[in-house]
């Protein structure tokens, strides 16, 4: 603790943001970092608590508290204060493989557990984390680190989302020969296709993929592991297989959409938007929202991202229907929190896009089954040519589970407290095992699964488990 009075002298200052009315016209990142002097002041606010709950990562009565990666937060906050960025990087990456991801998209449960936040404002832990890793890339401290020797053991990681990448990174540094297979055209999974560029730039994801490739990880794209012949081949060619395919099965909308065009799920809409805007794909599965009246069902990050994406595509109008009443979302001061997308909609349209306590009752169609509008439970009819469902996920897609013969019921069943499935040498981790969760929990799952796979291969492990 370099400055015992830091939390008394300095107030919380978050990274600034670009003007909502301006940023909706491009796909560039909207957060702007603080100057180094102000960032060091934010590091000085850390109290170096006797019990740093920020890094506990525990689940109590069904609620998660603190960082599941057990980030050494007080240590690198102190190093930010002293300007020792290199040492801060070494302590940060000891627990977190991808701070450039969590520093952008994590809801920061560490800050909710910050002792400084009990009677004041918590430390800007997420922003501080991002500043350390971005400084490391800018100063070229982040260089490829190949293992000193290879074990000769071959591991296949199926899926290249945050859990799969974290496991691959850990196992590669342990010296195993790691191949990551991905059914999409590019690796990254949710990070590449499920989060808009303005929140998580795709060049940031690709930068990490390139670094891992230089360190020895092999990526194979366009390979669908739900094919039984492919699954058998992978099991025969590799000493261990780790399934990290996410929980991408969307929760049904409960509407009669048979024969109706203009209805999709949030993940489909976001993926198509990324493919067009960032990956240069001319045709995508879901049409652009340009010139359309868009209605989004659901709340949470995916729904907000769909609002922001529709605005950038030039929609005519956008409305977000939230099932629960507005009172359920008010903070302690009776204010309604607004996500970045809601701020943008307010700036562009002059109104909050959310309507609370309302659901879609039925659909209105025109010629050839084209969606024309939606009838809501309060008796209103909204014009709508694109209806997007963002109501969460039911679990993992069954195809890969069936191909590998692993037992699953929405999520893959593994040994109690572990990651081994009912099939010899096949493991599972991430949302596929845990269910829909945060990127930071997926990374924690990947790290812990890597330790178990390493134990299986070598008879012992020196890899750390996060959960």
What residue spans do the PLM features occupy?
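Beta1-alpha1 glycine-rich phosphate/pyrophosphate-binding loop at the start
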Residues: 5-32, 41-44, 68-80, 118, ...
């Amino acid at each position: 603790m370099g400055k015992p009075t830091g939390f008394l002298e300095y107030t919380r200052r978050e990274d600034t943001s670009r003007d909502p009315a301006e940023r909706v016209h491009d796909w560039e990142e909207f957060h702007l970092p603080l100057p180094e002097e102000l960032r060091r002041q934010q590091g000085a606010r850390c109290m170096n608590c006797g019990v740093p709950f920020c890094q506990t990562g525990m689940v109590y009565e069904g609620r998660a508290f603190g960082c599941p990666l057990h980030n050494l937060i007080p240590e690198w906050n102190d190093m930010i204060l002293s300007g020792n960025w290199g040492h801060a990087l070494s302590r940060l990456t000891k627990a977190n493989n991808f701070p450039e991801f969590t520093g952008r998209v994590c809801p920061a449960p560490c800050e909710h557990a910050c002792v400084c936040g009990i009677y004041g404002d918590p430390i800007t832990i997420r922003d501080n984390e991002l500043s350390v890793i971005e400084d490391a890339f800018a100063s070229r401290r982040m260089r490829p680190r190949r293992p000193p020797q290879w074990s000769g053991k071959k591991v296949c990681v199926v899926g290249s989302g945050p859990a799969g990448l974290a496991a691959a990174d850990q196992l590669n540094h342990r010296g195993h020969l790691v191949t990551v297979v991905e059914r999409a055209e590019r690796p990254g999974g949710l990070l590449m296709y499920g989060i808009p560029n303005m929140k998580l730039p795709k060049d940031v994801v690709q930068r990490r993929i390139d670094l891992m490739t230089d360190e020895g990880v092999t990526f194979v794209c366009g390979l669908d592991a739900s094919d039984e012949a492919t699954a058998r081949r992978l099991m025969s060619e590799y000493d261990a297989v780790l399934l990290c395919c996410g929980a991408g099965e969307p929760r049904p909308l409960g509407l009669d959409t048979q024969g109706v065009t203009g209805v999709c799920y949030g993940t489909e809409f976001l993926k198509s938007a990324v493919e067009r805007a960032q990956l240069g794909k001319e045709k995508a599965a879901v049409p652009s929202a340009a010139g359309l009246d868009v209605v989004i069902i659901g709340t949470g990050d995916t729904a907000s991202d769909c609002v922001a994406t529709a605005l950038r595509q030039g929609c005519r109008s956008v409305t977000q229907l939230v099932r629960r009443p507005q009172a359920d979302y008010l903070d302690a001061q009776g204010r309604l929190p607004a996500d970045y997308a809601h701020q943008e909609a307010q700036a562009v349209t002059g109104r909050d896009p959310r309507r609370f306590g309302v659901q879609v009752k039925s659909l209105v169609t025109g010629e050839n089954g084209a969606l024309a509008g939606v009838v809501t439970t309060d008796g209103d009819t909204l014009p709508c040519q694109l209806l997007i469902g963002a109501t969460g996920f039911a679990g993992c897609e069954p195809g890969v589970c069936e191909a590998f013969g692993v037992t699953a019921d929405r999520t893959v069943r593994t040994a109690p407290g572990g990651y081994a499935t009912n099939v010899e040498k096949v493991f599972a981790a991430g949302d596929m095992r845990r269910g829909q969760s945060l990127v930071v929990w997926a990374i924690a799952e990947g790290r812990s699964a890597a330790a178990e796979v390493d134990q299986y291969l070598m008879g012992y492990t020196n890899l750390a488990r996060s959960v």
